[in-house]
Amino acid sequence: QIISSVALASFLFCLPVGAQEAAKQWSLEECIRYAIENNIDLKQKELEQKSREVDLHTSKYSWLPSVNASVGENFGFGRSESKDGLIVDRNSANTTAGIQLSMPIFDGLKIPNDIAARKLDLKASIETLNKAKEDLSINVASYYLQVLYNKEMLKIAQLQVDLSSEQVTKTEALYNAGKIPVSQLYDMKAQLAKDEVTLTESQNNVKLALLDLAQSLELERAGENFDVLEPENGDAIERYMSSIIPPDQVYDHAVTFKPQIKEQQYLLESQKKAIRIAQAGYYPKLNLSAGYSTGYYHNFGDGDYNNAPFSDQLKNNGQKSIGLSLSIPIFNRFQVRNSVRTARLSITNRELMMENSKKSLYKEIQQAYYNATAAQEKYISSDKSVDASKVAFSYAEERYGAGKSTVFEYSEAKTKYAQSLAEQTQAKYNFIFRTKILDFYNGTPITL
């Protein structure tokens, strides 16, 4: 009788009605994928990654020459010396134009080391983004399982309403036959009303859980058209029971690929390049420079002036130059030495951060392992509790139907059965979540 009621409640709950017919059911994988594509924090980290790409391009282009053009115009007024050595009154204009090139030939290997450092910084930013994606995936999975948990609690609440409604009908028949007092009938109706309140609360909990999940996905205006796909668990729990991996084994694997570890590795290597960049200040620097300039001179005002044509002056006044400049550091107020010392201190700090990241990862894996084993034990215990309370409720139901027990005894047995089902449901989804977290540390994507 109980089994048939459970089946009926589950069937009725799963029927699509009203707005649910148009609701799209999202799988966990779809939710995670959508969240990764639309999460604002991830988009900001993607921009940070693009910024590191720009830094790398800037560093690579440091080898290219710097080319600049210049144009000038000067005016002279009043007395000045002529080409014959005489002081005369005249006004003049002088136009100049030129182009200059400067290119580093050797800079103490600063540029190649800076390029290498920027490449490592870019890789570190990619791992930062990957870590954020992992955290978001776990967060979405948590909300998703909360929806499944609340939906199963709704089924349990519906079952309680169905059982109470069935007993109200039977109690009314007993009362009409004069076998029980009216007080028992009202007690049973009160129990039904209480179960209906619990059902309403469970329905609201499902809506709130769906809202939390939709908001975690940055899904706007989801409303009634958002729902989740309930996976077929089947023998999943049995598989999860045997999938708990020892923490040391998980850590040995996780430390080789987890993004938070790889990020610190890249940042440490980048800091080592920073020492080479600072040490470049000890070496001479060789630069190539070249240029071309020309000009036009023009006298104007009163007087007999012989101004050469503009094109002839530009051609005849041209001047070319090329040269090498060598800068040799002798004393720089210990700036280079202190820069190197600061870089070495930064390396030591990065090494400590690397070690701390590994220890934090191991602690997280240990915690995930013990949480999974504790959840496993709780689920096994709750499963036994359901079996026992189910038998007790069946016995109480038979006694009440035979008129050998009161409404309170029946309600107490039914309440204990409902509590055991709720505890089993909570233990089940907590166990699933904990095992998924442990598997995730071991490199297995979160799926259901």
Per-segment meaning from a language model:
Residues 20-143, 286, 290, 334-337, ...:
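Short flexible linkers and secondary-structure junctions
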Residues 19-68, 72, 221, 231-269, ...:
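Bacterial Sec-pathway N-terminal export signals of envelope proteins
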Residues 43-47, 60, 91, 105-133, ...:
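Sec/SRP-type N-terminal targeting helices
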Residues 135-253, 371, 375, 417:
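Periplasmic alpha-helical coiled-coil/stalk elements that build and connect Gram-negative outer-membrane
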Residues 4-14:
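Bacterial N-terminal signal peptides
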Residues 20-24, 70-103, 232-242, 276, ...:
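Small/polar, glycine/serine/threonine/aspartate-rich low-complexity segments that form flexible
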Residues 197-219, 386-444:
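Short segments within alpha-helical structural elements
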